[in-house]
C-alpha cells in the first residue's frame, strides 16, 4: 500500500507518546505505507551509547537532548517539500523547546499521532523489553515513574492530532486515510 504524499511545504508528522507506547510500530508502518523518511531519538543516540560505559540517567538525558537537536538540524537542512516522520516522546522537554525547534527548522505544517496508553500497559511493555534494551536506558527502577508519566502525558497539539488507543488493535488503514486527508 505504498502511496505518495505531498504537502507542498516542510512538514513533520510527530509520532508522540511515552516510552513503550507503540511509537516505533506506527512509525515503521507509516514509513512503509508512504515511503517517508523517519528520524527517532533512540536510533540517533544508541550508536553513541555503545561508546560509553556506565551511562547514568543524566547522561542518557544529555544524549537524548543531543539526538533531539540532531533531528531538527537534519530537518532544517532538508528541502522545503519533505515530509518527515519523527518518533519521540516529545514531553521529555518543555513544549516551548519543540516550538522553537519547529520554527528554526522551517517546519510549516505539523501533524501529530498521539499514542494513548494506560499506565499498566506502558509498564508491562517496558518491563518486557528491559533485557533487549541497550545499556544506558533506564531500567526497572523507571517503571513507577513511567506509570505516573503515562497517567498525565498529553499530546503537543501544534497541529491536527490523531489519537491511537493502544488498548485497541492498530488500524493503519484508518490512520493512513486520516493523514492523507489532513495533508491533502
Question: Which role does the model predict for each range below?
Answer:
Residues 15:
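Hydrophobic anchor at the beta1->P-loop junction of P-loop NTPases
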Residues 105-127:
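Conserved phosphate-donor/acceptor-positioning beta-strand/loop module used by diverse small-molecule
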Residues 24:
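Walker A/P-loop
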